[in-house]
Amino acid sequence: GITDDANITGLIALSAAFKKGWKWRDDLIRYLNKNLETLLNAIKNYKNASPLVPQATYLLWVSIKNPKHKNLQSHFEKYGVGINDGIEFGKKNNIRINFATNHQNIKKASKRIEEALINL
């Protein structure tokens, strides 16, 4: 349930993260930036797709100009890519890609995204 007391285990974990977690954080940011760069390289050659580079998240928004398909999520799923359709967030003709995964997944997804964009 909900309590107004701090959990001792949580406090210890928080203290450890602030004392010794900076290297892990920096490594994670570098890793995520590499994933982002891979995705941006896959998208940059398609005039119908405009990525919005995130400032503080691992979610890449991509605006799709004049898509032939109304349901972007099902279109990308046909190519084996799980995205969120922006319509769910009030952003019609946009997709959201979560790039917080391993590099191998991003490499595979990038190729599939390119195929999906070609046929969009």
Predicted regions located by residue number:
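Active-site PLP-lysine loop of aminotransferase-like
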Residues: 1-7, 87-88
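PLP-dependent enzyme catalytic core of the Aspartate aminotransferase-like
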Residues: 74-84, 89-120
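Residue-level recognition of strand-loop junctions within catalytic nucleotide-signaling folds
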Residues: 19, 63-65, 100-102
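Short alpha-helical functional segments enriched in proximate histidine and acidic residues
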Residues: 39-42, 116
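Acidic-histidine catalytic/liganding microenvironments
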Residues: 46
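Alpha-helical elements of Rossmann-like donor-binding domains used by nucleotide-donor carbohydrate transfer enzymes
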Residues: 12-16, 31, 38, 71, ...
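Conserved glycine-rich beta-strand-loop-beta hairpin in the small C-terminal domain of fold type I
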Residues: 8-11, 15, 24, 31-40, ...
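Preference for bulky hydrophobic residues occupying beta-strand positions
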Residues: 43, 62, 97-99
